[in-house]
Structures are given as structure tokens and as C-alpha cells.
Curated annotation (Swiss-Prot):
Encoding gene per record: nop12
Domain (RRM) ranges: 164-262, 270-348
Residue numbers spanned by region Disordered: 1-28, 60-94, 108-146, 346-366, 390-438
Pfam families linked to this entry: RRM_1 (PF00076)
PROSITE patterns the UniProt entry points to: RRM
Acidic residues compositional bias, start-end: 60-71
SUPFAM superfamilies in the record: RNA-binding domain, RBD
Similarity comment: family membership: Belongs to the RRM RBM34 family.
Location relative to the cell: Nucleus, Nucleolus
Species in which this protein is naturally found: Schizosaccharomyces pombe (strain 972 / ATCC 24843)
GO cellular component: nucleolus
GO biological process, one term: maturation of LSU-rRNA from tricistronic rRNA transcript (SSU-rRNA, 5.8S rRNA, LSU-rRNA)
Name this protein carries in UniProt: Nucleolar protein 12
Length: 438
């Protein structure tokens, strides 16, 4: 084998030498072939023959290594598995604890309710004792007395406050927004006494929003420039003396001042009804238009409570009846604003009766209608009369269905007939007795 390899090497070198000696050989190829070397032959390893003992020893060693690897794997698995088990146990324990806690809470609530019920029963039994019942009755009576006192005190306070309060109508709306005008109003009424508070009412707003919001945002109606006010004085005497301002001028307006506790009564003889007014009408033009007829007590335009706009009519009360007669002459005449007024005497409306007619309410009318259907008009007429009671015999001159009036002549004739009959019966008895004696 060594000889063959050496011969091959010699042949290669000789071939390369020939190629290099020739002038036509490419230098790159020459370099490649010069650098290339023959592939070395692989060296054969020595084979070792194993005996049975060696095989057994190797198997034992392999088994031990496998056992060690298995033990190490089992240890790792043991180290890993308990963690997952612990997690599962924790989860299971938490869920079990939730249910257990829930049932424990339910049991605790039931026990508390039982304890309360038992305590309530004991308290009820104790309360049933006459001493405690008397105490409870005293407490309830005291509470009732306190509540009655509180109600009475509230009523008394309200009455006192109403005695100190004055209603003012036809005030300019700028009194609410302008501080200077508000001060002028307080000065105008402070001449009669100290003023505690002023409350403004009948404010007309331009938007349909809550009244407090509209008041703070000052969204007042542009076509309504009058407001009402309640002025509370510190003394009732000052409130009574402030009534003298009724009909006086304040900021080019006629004021209507009236007491809250004792308002001015409405006299229909001195009052007129004015119709065909605009919904935006104000009191001041009416004061000026009807002022020529006579001195006026008040001008009241009836307004809608929600919008505070007029309903189209008003009432004007004069101080005497002469003003009413002069105001009636203005019927169907135009105001300076251009609307024709409808003027008439005010009428006192009587409250409507509860029953709709003389026949009674609906229940009685339905019963009467059923009776008419059943027994007719004649039977209904008989029902209204006094009927004879069952079980009593009718006397002479009485009708079993209805009592009739007996004439005096009939009574006299009946008495004469009875007397004659009695006399004839007496004569017969005497004759019969005489015959027996004979």
C-alpha cells in the first residue's frame, strides 16, 4: 500500500512539472494545482474485543447513570410539582374559604336576629307590665302635647308675622336688579318703622327654566316690568301705619299697599269688571285711565300663576259708587293704547251647591231611575207616600196603600149612625128583658 501511494505522488509531481514546463499553462491553474495536496488516507482504528464481564460492567454503569439521571429528574420534578400543588391548594382553599365565610356570615346574621327577637320578646314581656305601660302612655302623651305645642307655636308665629307683613303691588322690576332702587324702596317704607325683610314675588321669566336659575341669571321677561313684594316690619303697628301709602306714587307708579292678615274686602257695589285686556297689560295704565272717574282703592289684574302674565281681565274698586257710574260710561271705548274695553259691574259669585239639581246626586238619581223602570211613575208616586205597615189592621177611613183625608161631614154622619145604632140596640135589649119578666 505504501508503495502504491508513493508511485501516485511521483506521477502527480511529474504531471505538475510537465504542466509548469509548458508555456501555455494558465498561472492561476498552476497555483491551484501547486497548492492542492492529496487527500490523506484514513487511519484504521484498532478494534477491541469485549468479554462478557466487560459488557456486564458497562451495563451496570449505564444502569447506575440512568438511575442517577432519573433521580435527578424526579428531584427536579418534585421541586417543581409541589409549587403548582401549593398554588392549586391555595386557590382551592381561597374558594372554600369564601363559601365558608359566606355561610358563617349567614349563620351569624341568623343568630343576631334570633337574639334580637328574643330580646324584643323579653322587652315586650317587660313592657306589658303595668308600670312600664303607664310610663309609655305618659311618654306618648308628653310627645303629643309637645307636637301640639309646636303646631300652636308655629301658628302663633305665622300670625304674628302676617300682622307685621304688608303686600305691595305695581313695583317697577328694576327694584330687583338695581341696588340703588332697592335702597330707595327700603327708605320709602322705613319711615314707618324698621324693616326686617323684603321678598319679591310674581316675577315673569323669559325662559322655561327653574325659577332660581332664571333669577340668578336675571332672565326676566322683557314685556313685564312690574313685580310684587312682601315687606316684613319689626312691629305690627308700623305695618298698620304703612297702609297709608296705598294709592301713593313711587317711581312714577301708583302703589297698592294692603295688609296680609286683614286684607281690604271686595265690595261689588264699588267694583267694576274690565275685560278685553292684553295679556301683557300692566296696572299703571289702568290707574291713569280710570283715575278721572274717581279715587281708586286698588287695581287688580288676574294673572296666570305659572307665567305671571295676565288672563285678559281685571277688577277696579273705587272708594265710592260714583266712580262706578262714571267708569260704566267708558264701556266699548278705546284706551289710549288702542284696545276697546268691556266694562260692567262686578258680580258676587255664589259657591255652587254640592248637589247638581233638586233631584239629588248621581246615586239617588240612579236609584230613582231604576224604580221608575220597575214600577212606573204611578208606583214611584205611591212610594213617596206613607204606606200602611204590615201586620196592622186598617181603621175605617184609611186606605191600605195611602192615608186619605176624611171630611168633617163624613165624621159627623158616622157619629150619628153609631148613636142611632146604639139606641136601637138598647131598645131591643129593654123589650127583650120586659118579655122575660112577664
Amino acid at each position: 500500500m505504501g508503495e502504491t501511494n508513493s508511485s501516485l505522488d511521483n506521477e502527480n509531481t511529474s504531471f505538475v512539472g510537465k504542466l509548469s514546463s509548458s508555456s501555455n499553462v494558465d498561472p492561476t491553474l498552476n497555483l491551484l494545482f501547486s497548492q492542492s495536496k492529496p487527500i490523506p488516507k484514513p487511519v484504521a482504528k484498532e478494534t477491541t474485543v469485549l468479554t462478557k464481564k466487560d459488557v456486564e460492567v458497562e451495563e451496570a454503569n449505564g444502569v447506575e447513570e440512568a438511575a442517577e439521571t432519573i433521580e435527578s429528574d424526579t428531584k427536579e420534578v418534585q421541586n417543581i410539582k409541589p409549587k403548582s400543588k401549593k398554588k392549586k391548594k391555595k386557590l382551592n382553599d381561597s374558594s372554600d374559604d369564601i363559601e365558608g365565610k359566606y355561610f358563617e356570615e349567614l349563620l351569624a346574621e341568623e343568630d343576631e336576629e334570633k337574639d334580637k327577637d328574643s330580646a324584643g320578646l323579653i322587652n315586650d314581656e317587660e313592657d306589658k307590665s303595668p308600670a312600664k305601660q303607664s310610663v309609655l302612655e305618659e311618654r306618648t302623651s308628653q310627645e303629643d302635647v309637645k307636637s301640639e305645642r309646636e303646631v300652636a307655636e308655629k301658628l302663633a308665629n305665622e300670625l304674628e308675622k302676617s300682622d307685621k307683613t304688608v303686600f305691595v303691588n305695581n313695583l317697577p322690576a328694576r327694584v330687583v336688579t338695581n341696588k340703588g332702587d332697592y335702597k330707595d324702596l327700603t327708605k320709602h317704607f322705613r319711615q314707618f318703622g324698621a324693616v326686617d325683610s323684603i321678598r319679591f314675588r310674581s316675577l315673569a321669566f323669559s325662559e322655561a327654566i327653574p325659577r332660581k336659575v332664571a333669577f340668578f341669571e336675571k332672565k326676566f321677561h322683557s314685556e313685564r316690568d312690574t313685580v310684587n313684594a312682601y315687606i316684613v316690619f319689626r312691629d305690627s303697628s308700623s305695618a298698620r301705619s304703612a297702609l297709608s301709602l296705598n294709592g301713593t306714587m313711587f317711581m312714577d307708579r301708583h302703589l297698592r299697599v294692603d295688609s296680609v292678615s286683614h286684607p281690604m274686602p271686595q265690595d261689588t257695589k264699588r267694583c267694576v269688571f274690565v275685560g278685553n285686556l292684553a295679556f301683557e297689560a300692566e296696572e299703571e295704565p289702568l290707574w291713569r285711565y280710570f283715575g278721572d272717574c274717581g279715587s281708586i282703592d286698588y287695581v287688580r289684574i288676574v294673572r296666570d300663576p305659572k307665567t305671571n302674565l295676565g288672563k285678559g281681565f281685571a277688577y277696579i274698586q273705587f272708594k265710592d259708587t260714583m266712580g262706578v257710574d262714571k267708569a260704566l260710561l267708558l264701556n266699548e271705548k278705546k284706551m289710549p293704547e288702542g284696545r276697546t274695553l268691556r266694562i260692567m259691574r262686578a258680580k258676587s259669585t255664589k259657591p255652587k251647591s254640592i248637589t247638581r239639581s233638586k233631584r239629588g246626586d248621581e246615586k239617588t238619581r240612579t236609584l230613582q231611575g231604576r224604580a221608575r223602570k220597575l214600577i212606573g211613575k204611578a208606583g214611584n208616586a205611591l212610594l213617596q207616600q206613607e204606606l200602611a205597615l204590615e201586620g196592622h189592621r186598617a181603621k175605617p177611613g184609611e186606605n191600605p196603600l195611602a192615608k186619605k183625608k176624611v171630611n168633617k161631614k163624613r165624621k159627623e154622619r158616622a157619629a150619628q149612625w153609631r148613636n142611632k145604632k146604639a139606641e136601637s140596640v138598647g131598645k131591643k135589649q129593654k123589650t127583650a128583658a120586659g118579655k122575660k119578666d112577664k
